[in-house]
Amino acid sequence: MYFQILVLMSEGYGRSLFSEKHFPHDRQLLPPFTTTMSLGSFFSFPASSAFFDRKKDDGVIDNPNVELVNRNLWSTFLECGTEMIITKKGRRMFPLVKLKLSGLDKNSNYTIIMEMISVDKLRYKFWNGNWIVAGVGEHHPLPTCFVHPQSPRSGEWWMTDGVDFKMAKLSNNPFNNDGHIVLNSMHRYNPRFHIVRADSSGQPILASLKTFSFKETEFIAVTAYQNDVVTKCKIDNNPFAKGFRNIDTVRKRKMNQIISTPPASEDEEPEVKRTKSEIEAVMFSDPKVPQMSLQLISQWQEALLSTIVQIPITNQKSSSERKSGFGVVDLLGSS
């Protein structure tokens, strides 16, 4: 028989970990408090096992330690206030969380978990270049953890290859079934990382649980970037955003080509890119009727009328007109 155990973690958090440049009143707004958060993952344990008692251990001696590999990159974002996009389908984090592990027992298996913790109970908004408090934060009872898909693995494997959470996605959809981390927009979070040793059957040994966190990884969840500085920082550092880096240069080059390249003829003008409003105006404007000469219109009217009332049509063209071509009557024939 198996039971589902929900591990509850409690930890106190103080004031902001963001730069005071973007949270100038942080000292007064965020007094220390203690909160209880769910680890966000249920583990199945045999009813007869000793895992219910956190004091019991398997006798393995280890000293887990975690280092944030890309600390400098995270620090760069911290200076301008890191923002992470959340979507209903889920969005990957950037910067990625990359960890280096040490002090693990080489022959024991370990499970690595990333959990998102609310830094405070407040909701924020970006105003006048700074994040300010907009009110009381929303209640967040949903799981906010991501178990690394390679878990459990041996301590030797973790220490050799390290850990990254590139597969973790952030979402604002509480009904998603894809295992995404569900967060509230305009709330502040900081991930913490749990290392727990597993037995031969893959079940975690709770007594071995160790937790780590880094001040540099704090961020605000948003549905769209609020700070232009953050947007530029992500474009400059994200290898998948290199297509956006030279967009201004490309635009300037195209404008210079239009200005410097003369038209092919006096009647030809350089093509000007239309705006969205101009395109919509053309799409929804009244259709234009092509202009026809009065002579051609009268020929059509006379020809159509003759087919209805069967009035003979006399073709009274001069010899000069016949040489120049034929009219509508010639196409329809005469009676």
Swiss-Prot record:
Task: Say which domain of life the source belongs to.
Answer: Eukaryota
What does the record give under GO molecular function?
DNA-binding transcription factor activity, RNA polymerase II-specific; RNA polymerase II cis-regulatory region sequence-specific DNA binding
Q: Extract the Pfam families matched here.
A: T-box
SUPFAM superfamilies recorded: p53-like transcription factors
For this chain's UniProt record, which GO biological process terms are given?
A: cell fate specification; positive regulation of DNA-templated transcription; regulation of transcription by RNA polymerase II
Primary residence: nucleus
InterPro entries, per this entry?
p53-like_TF_DNA-bd_sf, T-box_DNA-bd, T-box_sf, TF_T-box, TF_T-box_CS
Its subcellular locations are: Nucleus
Annotated Gene Ontology cellular component terms = chromatin; nucleus; transcription regulator complex
Is Nucleus one of the keywords UniProt gives this record?
A: yes
Alphabetical UniProt keywords: DNA-binding, Nucleus, Transcription, Transcription regulation
The record places the DNA-binding region at 73-246
Which Gene3D superfamilies does its entry note? Transcription factor, T-box (2.60.40.820)
Q: PANTHER family given for it?
A: T-BOX PROTEIN-RELATED (PTHR11267), T-BOX TRANSCRIPTION FACTOR TBX6L (PTHR11267:SF198)
This chain's protein is named: Putative T-box protein 7
Natural source organism: Caenorhabditis elegans
Q: Which gene encodes it?
A: tbx-7
